[in-house]
Amino acid sequence: MVPPLWVARLIVSQATAEKLTARHGLDWQEVHDAFVCVSGLRYAWDDDPERGLRALVEAEIRGWPCVVVLYPVEDPLGDVYALGSAYPR
């Protein structure tokens, strides 16, 4: 059993926010609201040889099932992630 994933803070770059809108029709704030301080997230860890360790998290955004890629960020308070992307299915 994987331990629960808690996202206390989500870092979203301008480039990622623009990509979400242009490629996937999602607003970064919608993605943020689906994950930050939300319990019971379904996820799996993936260690990609090129991109490193990341969490692949399932969520529903605007009624669409999505997979969101989160990268752990070194932070003294912990539970901080950078948004990689979000893929509606």
Where are these regions (language model features)?
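Ribonuclease/tRNase effector modules and their secretory precursors
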Residues: 1-89
